[in-house]
Amino acid sequence: MHGFCGRLLHVDLGSGRAGYRDLDERRLRACLGGIGLGTSLLHEYAPPGVDPLSKDNPLIFTSAPLVGTSITTTAKFAVVTKSPLTGFIADSLSSSHFALELKRLGVDALVVTGEAPDFVYLSIDNDTVAIRDARHLEGKTSVETQTRVRAEVGGAWVASIGVAGEKRVRFATISNEGRHAGRGGVGAVMGAKKLKAIALRGSRETSVAHPRELDAFAAILRRRSLGPVTDKYRTIGTVANLGVFNRLGTLPTRNFQQATFDEADAISGEVLTENHFSRRHGCASCTIQCERLFTSQAGEQRLEYETLFALGSLCGISDPECVLEAAGLCDRYGLDTISTGGTIAWAMETADKGLLPEAHALGLRFGEGAGVLAAIHAIGAREGAGALLAEGSRRASMAVGGGSDAWAMHVKGLELPGYDPRSLKTMALGLAVSPRGACHNRSGAYEADFSGAVDRFHGDAARGGVVAASEDYAAVLDSLIVCKFLRKCFVDFYADAAEVLSRVTGWDCTGAELRSAGERIHTLKKLFNIRERWQPEDDWLPERLLRDTLPTGVAKGVALTPEELRDMVRGYYRAREWDERGFVPAAKTDALGIEDLSNGNVGTQKLPHNLESPRNRTLTPL
């Protein structure tokens, strides 16, 4: 088999056993790798109704067919599980050397189940698997953990959790090399298993069916990746978005009370670059090198737009030193910066309204940087008011009451990213219907709004088709896996991607086949959520966005009405060929071949696998 390895490794931390299992080529072709394969496996390994923080919730790491090839930006891996924040699917991506080592193990997926009695780390060196004591790593930051584990196992690449993951903060991340599988609380799931880290070292190369032809196409993509379509990412990086969005009236400010920030210039990408720039960096196997590291009194720190908005304008913070320090704290604790900023901003407003007196001990007020820093410490350690905030804005607002859910800015429990959707109507729909919750990465629906392809101030039912198409497109990118910053380097994405996949695998793949794969993958996500008690009211936006008009900026006076959103959601369901309430009919699952993907086991419990069956091989006793 080319491109894929045709097997997964299943490790059960409770029994201390591990074994391989074959993966059918039909499933791999139908779901690809990455998030597609991970979603398919989640249906199979997660018992219906499983508690996300229980031992039975699987933590699934997946590779993809393009990982380890000459195609730029493909050193990526996916993490898929049931989210402790939303109760629905959590799928997250991260990058760099850990991704390459996962593929070099000769597996397409690593499935971790069970719970260790004490904190451990998992060490995998090709076919040798060991569970090692990690009690000496408790309380260590993710960076400290990775450094220590690499020293102990001799240079492997490591992914780990910080203290937030140990404490099961519901938006804890899994970190590797300064990057994060960031959203949905995957780090809390890892912490609940008492798994502090995973160290990988492999030696297998990715088999490519037509290496010369692939290398020729890879060279074209590399040249395009250094051209004008990626110029923004290669010059200032994603922090450039803050100033742009402020001018467009889409920059979330003071917990979405405004969409412009009067002090945006103080933390703009241009000012950060002029006063704090340290160096440019990038993931392994990437020519774009979009990362920017900035210096502050607290040290050197990576910073992306989503972190800048969440810890900056969303909380009314205009001090770049404070934003950089806050970002560094989130990295060390292992916290999703979007959910951290969103939850803190909710707490600031709630305290302003006199409903959260314990927040005053942290100094939580809009514009007060010391309060943000204190809150991050409290959340990461689950101490004081941080114990409540560690639950995320949805659960915190339910506990506090007093109508505070009206300004808890989440969808399905996942805090909103850095786009005010009242003046981005396609984006509004994309956020509402996303299986992941409030997410900009699983559709990129904002592109239609920003490009002028549609009227961003007015929504209509036709946006449903736009969002559905963008979700399927993103699903293919996330399952091959290719960085979204490379997307515009493809002239005809589906045709070009099919050609790349054919050269890697030897299949005769078409663009139409990849389109169907994207729809299949997205539908699998939806089906998992339905299995986990999704209801139509979950595809909705926070009350504030449907009640308040934008008060400032070029979008002043623009509103998003419930009727407008309802019309777009219904149009989306029609575009998807789902029923009028958003449930997937059997005819659609049959047309996509979903029920056949895992021998009829999609949506059924298959835990634990018999690791000693003829299809599996028990490894070195653990």
Q: Which role fits each region the language model picked out?
A:
Residues 94-98, 342, 603:
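Solvent-exposed, well-ordered amphipathic alpha-helical segments
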Residues 1-234, 240-258, 396:
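Protein-protein interaction/assembly regions in multi-subunit complexes
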Residues 150-184, 190-602, 611:
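Extended C-terminal regions of large enzymes
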Residues 603-605, 612-618:
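Charged/polar low-complexity intrinsically disordered segments
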